[in-house]
Amino acid sequence: MTIDTRALGFGSSERAVYAADPWTTRGRLYQEDGSPTRSDFQRDRDRIVHTTAFRRLKHKTQVFIAQDGDHYRTRLTHTIEVAQIARALARALKLDEDLAEGVALVHDFGHTPFGHTGEDALHEVLLPYGGFDHNAQSLRIVTKLERRYAEFDGINLTWESLEGLVKHNGPLLTADGVGTRGPVPQPILDYCELHDLELATYASLEAQVAAIADDIAYNTHDIDDGLRSGYLTFDMLEEIPFLAGLMAEVRARYPHLEPSRFTHEIMRRQITRMVEDVIGVAQQRLSLLRPESAADIRAADRVIATFSEGMAETDRQIKAMLFKRIYRNPDIMRIRAGAAQIVTDLFAAYMANPKEMQSHYWVDHIAGLSDAPKARHVGDYLAGMTDTYAISAHRRLFDHTPDLR
């Protein structure tokens, strides 16, 4: 993908006309005085970093459970990697870097312990009460569950940050009001009654670069962790033409490189090529669209920050390899089954006896509730757990806790 380097931003450039503007934000649900030293998007990013939910990401994992080793990615390290890539993309495209970084930092807040396995298990037990969606849970955390301020629940982010959180993967509704990926989760609909996030339009370009940064980070670090664990080998990587090309480049330049350095050289190149591909596609689409404001980005009929056809095919090949070699590996499947059992057991135990939650706040809020609202509170409590806390809670309540190693 060809890039026009003359059009790139390098940190000192003014924002493009299509960038989100923190000085003309659509505001916050609760009116606040502005800051003399920080823009509204800077304040959003700072509020996100200071939340309890952000700190909990340190002990939430994605594929490899926390007990597997100290060097595997957690939700926190993944989030930091996504934020770095999102900020680099935003800088190159002359966007608001603080908004892009904020969306990247908050995008995983709603994830449960044990990654997608925990989410699937929690969704299953909550199905009679509306199910569970991590994106909707992220919104609940920043608008309701975080309790840090005297005047409101949540952290009162700007409309643009919340829009990016909810719509970073694209519109949730068609123009006719039909869900683009199934029914829109009720918590999102409820919030839109108060503060319409315009679910039928695309999000800002800042949110779009955060979304594609998530894909880039996932693909890269799951390969890195897969090689570290032994579930992937260099021979497996060479089955994908893009990765085979990167490996050939590294071998040609460093013919006697040790395996760990060889891996990192591949990963560096993978991130760079994918980032450059996205920049090139975005430049092409922006030149065709000729947007004059952030509103023009939202009104566009397609995403702007995305992979080229060739890189999208590479993305599919990498995901297929990871699914086959890691996510469906028998060892990982055994661990996933145990993790799902922990979530299911804890939900049943807390529904039967909320006092087992050992938290006055949650117990006081559940007292006297019917099953549906009680289940939602229990779901909130479980979703906020880290891997390590969920394991210890299960050990306290049950005679046998699955071995997740």
Curated annotation (Swiss-Prot):
One of its GO terms (biological process) is dGTP catabolic process. It comes from the Bacteria. SUPFAM superfamilies: HD-domain/PDEase-like. Signal peptide: none annotated. Residues 75-219 form the HD domain. InterPro entries: dGTPase (IPR006261), dGTPase-like (IPR050135), dNTPase_2 (IPR023023), HD/PDEase_dom (IPR003607), HD_domain (IPR006674), PHydrolase_assoc_dom (IPR026875). Keywords: Hydrolase. One of its GO terms (molecular function) is dGTPase activity. HAMAP family: dGTPase_type2. PANTHER family: DEOXYGUANOSINETRIPHOSPHATE TRIPHOSPHOHYDROLASE-LIKE PROTEIN (PTHR11373:SF43), DEOXYNUCLEOSIDE TRIPHOSPHATE TRIPHOSPHOHYDROLASE (PTHR11373). Belongs to the dGTPase family. Type 2 subfamily. This is Deoxyguanosinetriphosphate triphosphohydrolase-like protein. It comes from Rhizobium johnstonii (strain DSM 114642 / LMG 32736 / 3841) (Rhizobium leguminosarum bv. viciae). The lineage of its organism: Bacteria, Pseudomonadati, Pseudomonadota, Alphaproteobacteria, Hyphomicrobiales.
